Amino acid sequence: MFSGASAINLDAKGRIAMPKRHREPLHAHHNSQLVITVDIQSPCLLLYPVQEWQQIAVKLSQLSDTQPAERAIKRMLLGYAHECELDGNGRILLPTPLRQYANLEKRAMLVGQLNKFELWDEAAWQQQIEESRIAILNEDLAANQRLADFSL
């Protein structure tokens, strides 16, 4: 399970170094293999351990090629999907189309989301956090069945 937000940098070749605390679990449980794709609702990338991605792929295979919305989701997620493996230094190369989609240039945030990571441009992440904070403050959490009993 992945959690926490880490500030990271892209090098001149478009590589990121996975934070050390995530390298060993990725190596031990996922053979250092990831699939990177786009988030269809936010300007960020999603990094899935390959086994997690296989579950997503099964769900995608059940979507219709004749329904425009379903086909669009498949096209985005599968079209951008890129398999990669951490190198000996714990780095992964982000292909140019993926970097462009998320506007990744130099400074980024890698955010653990239990079964996957999100990779954000640092400024976009800060903006998203502020928007989320405001949305939570303005939301009637008791009206949301799934959040009504949620407590920390």
Swiss-Prot record:
<keyword id="KW-0804">Transcription</keyword>
<protein>
    <recommendedName>
        <fullName>Transcriptional regulator MraZ</fullName>
    </recommendedName>
</protein>
<feature type="domain" description="SpoVT-AbrB 1">
    <location>
        <begin position="5"/>
        <end position="52"/>
    </location>
</feature>
<dbReference type="InterPro" id="IPR037914">
    <property type="entry name" value="SpoVT-AbrB_sf"/>
</dbReference>
<dbReference type="InterPro" id="IPR035644">
    <property type="entry name" value="MraZ_C"/>
</dbReference>
<dbReference type="Pfam" id="PF02381">
    <property type="entry name" value="MraZ"/>
</dbReference>
<comment type="subunit">
    <text>Forms oligomers.</text>
</comment>
<dbReference type="InterPro" id="IPR020603">
    <property type="entry name" value="MraZ_dom"/>
</dbReference>
<comment type="similarity">
    <text>Belongs to the MraZ family.</text>
</comment>
<dbReference type="GO" id="GO:0003700">
    <property type="term" value="F:DNA-binding transcription factor activity"/>
</dbReference>
<dbReference type="GO" id="GO:0005737">
    <property type="term" value="C:cytoplasm"/>
</dbReference>
<dbReference type="InterPro" id="IPR038619">
    <property type="entry name" value="MraZ_sf"/>
</dbReference>
<dbReference type="GO" id="GO:0009295">
    <property type="term" value="C:nucleoid"/>
</dbReference>
<dbReference type="InterPro" id="IPR003444">
    <property type="entry name" value="MraZ"/>
</dbReference>
<dbReference type="InterPro" id="IPR035642">
    <property type="entry name" value="MraZ_N"/>
</dbReference>
<keyword id="KW-0805">Transcription regulation</keyword>
<dbReference type="InterPro" id="IPR007159">
    <property type="entry name" value="SpoVT-AbrB_dom"/>
</dbReference>
<keyword id="KW-0963">Cytoplasm</keyword>
<dbReference type="GO" id="GO:0000976">
    <property type="term" value="F:transcription cis-regulatory region binding"/>
</dbReference>
<keyword id="KW-0238">DNA-binding</keyword>
<keyword id="KW-0677">Repeat</keyword>
<feature type="domain" description="SpoVT-AbrB 2">
    <location>
        <begin position="81"/>
        <end position="124"/>
    </location>
</feature>
<dbReference type="GO" id="GO:2000143">
    <property type="term" value="P:negative regulation of DNA-templated transcription initiation"/>
</dbReference>
